[in-house]
Amino acid sequence: MIIEEAQAINSFFRSESSKEVYGLIWLLVPILTLVLGITIGVLVIVWLERKISAGIQRRIGPEYAGPLGILQALADGVKLLFKEDLLPSRGDIRLFSVGPSVAVVSILLSYSVIPFGYHLVLTDLSIGVFLWIAISSIAPIGLLMSGYGSNNKYSFSGGLRAAAQSISYEIPLTPCVLSISLLSNSSSTVDIVEAQSKYGFWGWNLWRQPIGFLVFIISSLAECERLPFDLPEAEEELVAGYQTEYSGIKFGLFYVASYLNLLVSSLFVTVLYLGGWNLPIPYIPITELFEINKTSEVFGTTISLLITLAKAYLFLFIPISTRWTLPRLRMDQLLNLGWKSLLPIALGNLLLTTSSQLVSL
């Protein structure tokens, strides 16, 4: 009996179905690893923001949930999971329920084209940066669905503001990304990072595209709805904007989506302008820092991951500090800044970049 069972198990592992199962498992492993890493990254961002905000306001911040309050975000998430999920009695339940998921999924898909390190990217596409812009434009649709489905004037106004703000600041963002693609001769995120590796710190696109860098930062803050661009969630005007009618896990999804978007923006700033995983030392790419064997390749990949995350988290100090130092703009000021200031500057920067590339041919 035991021999027959062993033979059956052996025949299964040799069959075609077992190969398909193994293929499916190996397909899910990198995706699940990425989701786990993103979750940990969001928890770290929440803790950093609370601690930095407390320091700016001369408070202590979270300190009881885990060492130094590191588990406070996890405690808040568990609390939201067990809260009652209320539905508006006269709202559109389908749109109300689907809206948060659309916002979160569209942002999660953006992580698939981000190179976290050397040979550490889920999909290296030739149109990676433009795929990110296309995917990120889906998130405002979810916010508009949430605002309309809530059947609440404050929620609907917040959804309309979110859609208008996203459209206004995605357009200046696109010429900045196109300028980087022209300099790197590629739209692949991996190629863009490798194009910045030759001259170390001075080879970063930050110095080659200073105007585009400033426009990109401002547009990214507006896309993330961070102060001074948090008009869709202005508490004094709209209670909580499109989140007004939400509670429980659906409200938690919006909470997670805002920090996911913030992390995506920081990582793309790192990839496009701060050299990605490259060290700020000239002529020493991270791929050539170690001898080529399996152990050193794993070590080099780990180091490149740490370098990318260190740059991204250092950049996070800018959006966190602006939250407590700059006043909120009016809606007309926000739209004028996007259409009348940033868009002409971004187009002018693209024209200069194109001209310089043509002259250098």
Curated annotation (Swiss-Prot):
Record-listed E.C. numbers: 7.1.1.-
Catalyzed chemical reaction(s): a plastoquinone + NADH + (n+1) H(+)(in) = a plastoquinol + NAD(+) + n H(+)(out); a plastoquinone + NADPH + (n+1) H(+)(in) = a plastoquinol + NADP(+) + n H(+)(out)
Alphabetical UniProt keywords: Chloroplast, Membrane, NAD, NADP, Plastid, Plastoquinone, Quinone, Thylakoid, Translocase, Transmembrane, Transmembrane helix
A matching Pfam family: NADHdh
GO CC, alphabetical: chloroplast thylakoid membrane
Transmembrane segments: 25-45, 102-122, 125-145, 246-266, 298-318, 334-354
GO molecular function, one term: oxidoreductase activity, acting on NAD(P)H, quinone or similar compound as acceptor
GO process annotations (BP): aerobic respiration; photosynthesis, light reaction
UniProt xrefs under HAMAP family: NDH1_NuoH
Function: NDH shuttles electrons from NAD(P)H:plastoquinone, via FMN and iron-sulfur (Fe-S) centers, to quinones in the photosynthetic chain and possibly in a chloroplast respiratory chain. The immediate electron acceptor for the enzyme in this species is believed to be plastoquinone. Couples the redox reaction to proton translocation, and thus conserves the redox energy in a proton gradient.
Family membership: Belongs to the complex I subunit 1 family.
Protein name: NAD(P)H-quinone oxidoreductase subunit 1, chloroplastic
